[in-house]
């Protein structure tokens, strides 16, 4: 139990172009060394590419991709009597979004395209269609949870 009062969550302002809070949050995830303008350029460039390649609304593709990547369950280590068990636990909504964004960023970084905005655009399109490295990460997480279902009674 915390000894001090709970620190309030900071409100994130929606991004200027699309008015989306999720996109503004993703911008903060992509940002390195406080360079928000660079992150903004990468994301808006990626969304432009998505619009050109798919012909669909870029923000809809982004939201669909994020929703497809969000994990429902994950495993946490729990020590019981000298043995470590991987216990499946449900993921809280805030963490779901954070994990999805982090996985999307990491998957985009590992792609082969020339610039980050092209990589991100490719990963967004793949994730919105249910494939790609970020989706594989989600499936692997779910498989781990399914495989360790027997230890779910150790939940705390």
Curated annotation (Swiss-Prot):
MF GO annotations: rRNA binding; structural constituent of ribosome; tRNA binding
Assembly mode: Part of the 30S ribosomal subunit. Contacts proteins S9 and S11.
Keyword line: Ribonucleoprotein, Ribosomal protein, RNA-binding, rRNA-binding, tRNA-binding
Alphabetical list of InterPro entries matching this protein: Ribosomal_uS7, Ribosomal_uS7_bac/org-type, Ribosomal_uS7_CS, Ribosomal_uS7_dom, Ribosomal_uS7_dom_sf
Domain of life per record: Bacteria
Organism: Bordetella pertussis (strain Tohama I / ATCC BAA-589 / NCTC 13251)
Signal peptide positions (record): none
Similarity field: Belongs to the universal ribosomal protein uS7 family.
Cellular compartments per GO CC: small ribosomal subunit
CDD domains noted in UniProt: uS7_Bacteria (cd14869)
Gene3D superfamilies for the chain: Ribosomal protein S7 domain
Functional summary from the UniProt entry: One of the primary rRNA binding proteins, it binds directly to 16S rRNA where it nucleates assembly of the head domain of the 30S subunit. Is located at the subunit interface close to the decoding center, probably blocks exit of the E-site tRNA.
Name of protein: Small ribosomal subunit protein uS7
Keyword Nucleotide-binding: no
Membrane as UniProt keyword: no
GO biological process: translation
């Amino acid at each position: 139990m915390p000894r001090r009062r709970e620190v309030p969550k900071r409100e994130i302002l929606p991004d200027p172009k699309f008015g989306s809070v999720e996109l503004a949050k993703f911008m903060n995830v992509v940002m390195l060394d406080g360079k928000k303008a660079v992150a903004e350029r990468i994301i808006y460039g990626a969304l432009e590419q998505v619009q050109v390649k798919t012909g669909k609304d870029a923000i809809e593709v982004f939201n669909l991709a994020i929703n497809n990547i969000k994990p429902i369950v994950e495993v946490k280590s729990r020590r019981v009597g000298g043995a470590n068990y991987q216990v499946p636990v449900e993921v809280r909504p805030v963490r779901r979004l954070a994990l999805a964004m982090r996985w999307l960023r990491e998957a985009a970084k590992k792609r082969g395209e020339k610039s980050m905005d092209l990589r991100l655009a490719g990963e967004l399109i793949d994730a919105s269609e249910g494939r790609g490295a970020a989706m594989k990460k989600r499936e692997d997480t779910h498989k781990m949870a399914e495989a360790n279902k027997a230890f779910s009674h150790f939940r705390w």
